[in-house]
Amino acid sequence: MLEPTDPLVRARRVFYAGMGALADAIAAAAPPETAIHIKWPDALYVNWGLVGGGRLAWPNSADEASVPAWLVFGATIRTAWSGRIDPGLTPELTALDEEGFAEVNSKQIVEGFARNFMQALDSCQEGGFAMAVRPYLERLARESRHNCEIDENGDLLVQPVSGGATERQALLPRLKAPAWLDLAYKEPS
């Protein structure tokens, strides 16, 4: 649980620090040559298969212009198949044990996440938000012909390298309804 000092409209950017910390924790535990990517804003992929994602919660009564009483970053990662999904029929989905993480336990990933997240929060206090969001942007899956930035309110700004109009992708609606999460089964799908 976090106690933000910024209004909600800016405080929710901490989500990117959480996602970057999670991706880096999984990368640190991964076998060599394992690709770890984030699909904007909240889905985590290992070797281009969905393994999970992150979520951010805040009080329902929180106003965008006011400092919320709390924020909570949470994540769901599929470490092994639940039996509900046949991995042979769903190549777009995967589990950590299928990607060579057999010797890795959840405790190692949680510890790595905690270290990375605390470091990201410290970086944010010392060097500003741009420092904390760097690990996220480095893992963001995007076309090489685009530059990406995170706006003050957390929206993704996508700028073609060749110039042209910047595209804005709103964060708030995506946090309210994560596309990667099957709410009925409470697992990535």
What are these regions (language model features)?
Residues M1:
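Active-site-flanking beta-strand signature of metal-NTP-handling nucleotidyl enzymes
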